[in-house]
């Protein structure tokens, strides 16, 4: 029995060749089909050069297991989520490696209603079946079919339902950097909707054409070197906002009108405010790493903040429990109740653009006030031999004088004027530190250095 190392905690990712190839993709399709026994599922793929061949091998495996396959073609992950819940099919698989290096590919798997399939919700079972590779003979009489379809119109209809075009009362200039990934065709369709409604929004498109050679680098705007082209275009065109996507556009990253990159933490607050203007009293889910800005905005706007452990499975589950309208992580993952609790990289920028018009404000001024009120360190990673021992040591140092302690995810320790969260990574031998203060950048910086010194 071969061990398939491409199966990770939440998805499938591997180096092309030994770790992931067409034979393995076929086996994954067979395993998904044998385990879940779906009648019909959707598949799609990103722009990577191997995505089409891997997707077709995957589809062959699904069909040999008796599953009918609907292929939506070039797509971002959220288009698979949408197609799965909108069409009412039994599951979906997107072939994507998002922002991984060129020589990688992968898959993201969901079941009915676009519910995620990860380690403890079926991924280990699919892995076991794919590794054993002992599938029953193919029955030609019950072999599935393959059909190409498009859900682009219905998907963009859904996106446009989050905003009211009548609110776009002033001209907006938006730089959109698709990173030669999968986002371009969606932006083109959204642009048509704005134009048809006579809405004065101009799109300046950077690295717009899908190109699996990634001539401008792998699209991962979390890396500072991947931000320059977006920032330059914002400056050159004097744009109101810059928007940059990763390869499968399940995350979007925003730049203000002065071309400054906005940390994901402050975007959560903006989106919470946007939703609470539409639905006062709604519940908003946030993660424990940085919280004060989000809690402040939610309570000021009449909403209810609810904290969840970090990670998409935890946030989606908590959103369902609480019937929360929106959940946000500082890592640029944003989840929406009406999007089957899935994350979307398209909904956030639409809501922020609408908010700019509603508040008749620049993005710089909206965010600068929040950054001044709650300055944050951003996430700092440190490799440690014994992470648990380090966290215990930090806790012993800071707990006695603390105003509040929370262990939802690692440890969060609060004092009246500053707080921090220290947690281990689910995937690497590192600890992750986040520090924030109340309107005191010097204090936040000093405490960050103090804790980092103790971690050595």
UniProtKB/Swiss-Prot annotation:
Catalytic activity, EC: 5.4.2.8
Binding site for Mg(2+): 98, 246, 248, 250
Pathway where it operates: Nucleotide-sugar biosynthesis; GDP-alpha-D-mannose biosynthesis; alpha-D-mannose 1-phosphate from D-fructose 6-phosphate: step 2/2; Bacterial outer membrane biogenesis; LPS O-antigen biosynthesis
SUPFAM superfamilies with a match to the protein in the record: Phosphoglucomutase, C-terminal domain (SSF55957), Phosphoglucomutase, first 3 domains (SSF53738)
The record's free-text note on cofactor binding: Binds 1 Mg(2+) ion per subunit.
The keyword Plastid belongs to this UniProt entry's keyword annotation: no
Active site: 98 (phosphoserine intermediate)
Catalytically driven reaction(s): alpha-D-mannose 1-phosphate = D-mannose 6-phosphate
Enzyme class of the recorded protein, top EC level: isomerase
Entry function: Involved in GDP-mannose biosynthesis which serves as the activated sugar nucleotide precursor for mannose residues in cell surface polysaccharides. This enzyme participates in synthesis of the LPS O9 antigen.
Descriptive protein name: Phosphomannomutase
Protein source organism: Escherichia coli
GN (gene name): manB
